[in-house]
């Protein structure tokens, strides 16, 4: 259950990052509210996951999901540039996440 909570927490990190971008410096009410609700839920699920997962594993996976997810949303939704170096960086992050998962005791 901790891994499911951690995965959802990571996805919610992507949601709040995207909503924050849409909030235009917190000047637009709906994206601002979505940002803070998603942050609250993301942190809550991360805290739940940390009850049974090691700190380093949980935090690394959470930030990794957020980083790669924001990268993908930036490209797919916002039309950000795709370069070989950026894609390689995302692949390395995902590789690290897989290694953290397979080496975790929980």
Which positions does each model-derived feature cover?
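Polytopic alpha-helical membrane proteins, predominantly small-molecule transporters/carriers
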Residues: 1-106
């Amino acid at each position: 259950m901790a891994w499911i909570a951690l995965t959802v927490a990571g996805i919610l990190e992507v949601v709040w990052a995207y909503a924050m971008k849409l909030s235009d410096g917190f000047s637009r009410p709906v994206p601002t509210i979505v940002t803070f609700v998603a942050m609250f839920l993301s942190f809550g699920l991360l805290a739940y996951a940390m009850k049974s997962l090691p700190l380093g594993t949980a935090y690394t996976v959470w930030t990794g999901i957020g980083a790669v997810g924001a990268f993908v949303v930036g490209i797919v939704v916002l039309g950000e540039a795709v370069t070989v170096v950026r894609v390689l960086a995302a692949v390395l992050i995902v590789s690290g996440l897989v290694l953290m998962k397979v080496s975790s005791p929980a």
